[in-house]
From Swiss-Prot:
Record-listed E.C. numbers: 6.-.-.-
Protein name listed in UniProt: Putative cysteine ligase BshC
Described purpose of this protein according to its UniProt entry: Involved in bacillithiol (BSH) biosynthesis. May catalyze the last step of the pathway, the addition of cysteine to glucosamine malate (GlcN-Mal) to generate BSH.
Annotated source species: Staphylococcus aureus (strain bovine RF122 / ET3-1)
Coiled-coil stretches: 422-450
Annotated Pfam families: CC_BshC, Rossmann-like_BshC
InterPro entries registered for this protein in UniProt: Bacillithiol_biosynth_BshC, CC_BshC, Rossmann-like_BshC
Length: 537
């Protein structure tokens, strides 16, 4: 597999500014992610004393998996005080989208580089956000149909949308297998298809909860790298978190004030507010099989779906004795994660790291230091067919990754068109606009006639526009093979107006290039970069 790094002219300059140590951006975080001294400081930080208990919890969580020797060793390293590189994500259908795998590769790559540089073991940890309840975000994925040159949405359907946390959701296995079958119908048959389908079927048969199936697929893929997994909703982990839940409840107003102040500061720097929440407690409570947002009205803590209320002593008592009923929101999850782990760096996506920029004062309030916040690696897979099509039409890969292919497609069509025809139609449009202005001058002051002239002009312009569009459409239809190839480029490299990794599913790559494509023996060794990585399997 070939691997190269390209620099893109990104529309969003947040990550390039992190790369260049822009003082406005670095001032939003505790550490400058582009400076080696930041890593030296984090590597030398004193541990919090929770590492042995945390290692036991992770071992228990992964007890339904057959651990690799690398994972066994990393659990031991964690118990002995090794620091971690961590990142997480919701449990997407069939492991998707691709950027989840890329986030794990980011964690693996950075932890290895730190281990090699500092001669201290750094453990890769992936945090499954099983406490989330927005099932609409994880119940679907996309598959690319090569025959049609188009993407198709594949969705797991359920009669009732679960309102509990994703970790508490148990999908219908028959329906899930039907969803899997639908996905594979769209994918081309390869020598890897049957083996991959058997792996997925076995996972569905062997595991029951949505997040356990997700965990099993990730484990199958990344166990050889020694990656450790933990679900935020795992009950033994929640019991460890009880002291912090109590602190959050006691300081909820100060926490909310700190968050709002930091968010306002980021907006004053010209950034858009990322975290949208009305709560002033920033916790959820599981009640009546629903994950309910907690808010405080000045006298009581109130649940948003059942309107159940608690006085402070009651809700703190729940946190102490039944912490598994609580879960964090986007504000408190990073805080809880860092309170638990001895983290060198947190790996986040482009939007995620902007969330963290709004939390600096929250960390300081609880005397928890924000770790180095690193943008994850961004990766695109380029196969031989798409590379040949790009070459055929002389289209730069970097341009497609940023802007898509529509501009190049339009340019191609116009080059095939009669320039005289287009010029004459455009000339007629310009002539009509001049005529319209002359007529308006003639009827100035008479609103009825002004309306009549403008309406007449609108009809003429629409007719000329229609003529030009239909003429170009006819050229498209006469060149349907080329149009399909442009569509292939778009759906492969810039699907739905964004990067491939945000839409494509990992099963597509596994099916095309083999079930071992992500394994250490096959996948190219990566170096951490803020730029874009192109991999040619």
């Amino acid at each position: 597999m070939d691997c190269k790094v390209v620099s893109l002219n990104e529309k969003d300059q947040f990550i390039p500014k992190i790369k260049s140590s822009d003082p406005v951006i670095t001032g939003l975080f505790q550490y400058d992610a582009a400076q080696q001294t930041s890593f030296e400081k984090r590597m030398s930080k004193e541990n919090n004393g929770r590492e042995a208990a945390l290692a036991n919890v992770i071992r228990e969580y992964m007890s339904d998996l057959k651990l690799s020797s690398e994972q066994e060793l990393n659990i031991q390293h964690l118990a002995n005080g090794s620091k971690v590189v961590i990142g997480g994500q919701q449990a997407g259908l069939f492991g998707g989208p691709l950027y989840i795998f890329h986030k794990i590769f980011s964690i693996i790559t950075l932890s290895k580089e730190l281990t090699d540089t500092h001669k201290q073991q750094v453990v890769p940890v992936f945090w499954i956000a099983g406490e989330d309840h927005d099932f609409d975000e994880v119940n679907h994925t996309f598959v690319y149909n090569e025959n049609h040159g188009s993407l198709h949405k594949v969705k797991y359907h359920t009669m009732e949308m679960p309102e509990t946390t994703i970790s508490r959701y148990y999908p219908d296995k028959a329906e899930l297998k039907q969803t899997l079958k639908t996905m594979f119908i769209h994918m081309k048959e390869t020598v890897h298809t049957q083996g991959l389908l058997e792996i997925c079927d076995r996972i569905i048969d062997q595991y029951d909860s949505w997040t356990d199936m997700f965990k099993a697929l990730l484990h199958e893929t990344f166990k050889a790298y020694g990656v450790l997994f933990i679900d935020a909703q795992f009950e033994p982990l929640r019991k460890m978190e009880a002291p912090m839940f109590k602190k959050i409840l006691k300081k909820h107003q100060l926490l909310d004030d700190a968050f709002r102040a930091t968010q306002q500061r980021t907006q004053n720097q010209g950034l858009k507010a990322m975290i949208q929440t009305d709560t002033n407690v920033h916790l959820f409570l599981h009640d009546e099989n629903m994950r309910q947002l907690v808010s405080y009205d000045g006298k009581h803590f109130k649940l948003n779906k059942t309107d159940k209320t608690y006085v402070k002593e009651e809700i703190i008592n729940i946190a102490e004795n039944q912490p598994e009923l609580f879960s964090n929101n986007v504000v408190t999850r990073p805080l809880m994660e860092e309170w638990l782990f001895n983290t060198v760096a947190f790996i986040g996506g482009p939007s995620e790291i902007k969330y963290w920029a709004e939390l600096k004062d929250v960390f300081e309030l609880f005397d928890v230091e924000m770790p180095i916040v690193m943008p994850r690696l961004r990766i695109t897979y380029l196969n031989d067919r798409i590379e040949k099509i790009l070459s055929k039409y002389n289209i730069p890969l970097e341009k497609v990754l940023v802007d898509g292919v529509e501009g190049e497609r339009s340019k191609f069509i116009r080059e095939l068109a009669s320039h005289q025809f287009i010029e004459k139609v455009e000339g007629m449009i310009e002539q009509q606009r001049r005529l319209n202005q002359d007529l308006l001058d003639e009827v100035a002051g008479n609103q009825n006639n002004i309306n009549l002239v403008n309406k007449n002009n609108e009809i003429h312009i629409q007719q000329y526009d229609y003529l030009l569009k239909r003429y170009l459409l006819n050229i498209e239809r006469e060149n349907d093979i080329s149009m399909k190839q442009f569509r292939e480029i778009q759906e492969t490299l810039h699907p739905m107006g964004g990067l491939q990794e945000r839409i494509w599913n990992p099963l597509q790559i596994l099916n095309d290039f083999g079930t071992d494509v992500f394994k250490p023996s096959t996948y190219p060794p990566l170096s951490y970069t803020f730029d874009h990585i192109i991999i040619k399997p």
